């Protein structure tokens, strides 16, 4: 009897669509000028002081180089896949997934601004939003129908691991070793945005699912 083999990995369409937008945005950024677009549409605390709120969103689709965009895309593919499936692959579920991604990204930028209220460094990249997807994915690591509790081993382990990674990134930045960070291109890593996005994803995933009646 002939059996159909399941693919090893099948990304849901909202994740594929999100990655398509990110890659298309960086292709356009590369064509126009990576630094020029980043300086114009990237996020900084200064942009908030100037009452420019668009960079809170536009920065999530810009990157500093191909290595940067590919590393973030891999994170989104890995952690966004289970999250998108939990939201559901219909129109409402996709809207919930995209909204969750954007909210985590915006809050990650605001977290960075809170840590650097007078800073003028420009932040670009999907890593803050991807961190939110990672946190949400940790709450799906359970055999039951609900979400894993905050105090469960998978949730605590992933949060601890991500905290440790970002403390190392912070130390590397202090020591001037940013060039050793994969995908950074030698630029400082906005580790504060990573942690803020992770916290946002961890806290907001459950309430959003409940609001959408998909808990």
What residues fall within each predicted segment?
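A detector for small-residue-rich transmembrane helices and their helix-helix packing motifs
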Residues: 1-215
